[in-house]
Amino acid sequence: MSSVPASAYLTLAIILFCIGLFGALTKRNTVIVLVCIELMLNAANLNLVAFSKLGLFPNLTGQIFSLFTMSVAAAEAAVGLAILIALYRNRPTVHVDEMDTLKG
């Protein structure tokens, strides 16, 4: 059995999610916003692993779903960075406020 209580995992996940949410809502740099979204996804993964390991009937379902979520997050980051590079070639800025128009 684990010596770390479940509340410690959940508290850490809440803190990580709140930091990611704060960064995603307040920062204007697109790269930082993508990193904050990844931080929020990692907090959700921590919850999945904690509940699957420390639940009443421990099984691998949460851990497998967490691996699936990590692969989707990697694809999301790759697509997001590709879009960011394409936008940066047309307009040399990475700020969210200046990327609200499609033509320009």
UniProtKB/Swiss-Prot annotation:
Q: Which domain of life is it from?
A: Bacteria
Record-level GO cellular component terms: NADH dehydrogenase complex; plasma membrane
Which keywords label this protein?
Cell membrane, Membrane, NAD, Quinone, Translocase, Transmembrane, Transmembrane helix, Transport
Chief location category: membrane
Compartments, record wording: Cell membrane
Tell me what topology the record assigns in the membrane: Multi-pass membrane protein
Q: Where are the transmembrane segments?
A: 4-24, 31-51, 67-87
Supply the EC number(s). 7.1.1.-
Q: InterPro entries recorded for this chain?
A: NADH_UbQ_OxRdtase_chain4L/K, NUOK/Mnh_C1-like
Q: What class of enzyme is it?
A: translocase
> Is Acetylation tagged as a keyword?
no
Hey, which family's this protein in? Belongs to the complex I subunit 4L family.
Database matches in HAMAP family: NDH1_NuoK
Q: What is this protein called?
A: NADH-quinone oxidoreductase subunit K
Organism field: Bacillus mycoides (strain KBAB4) (Bacillus weihenstephanensis)
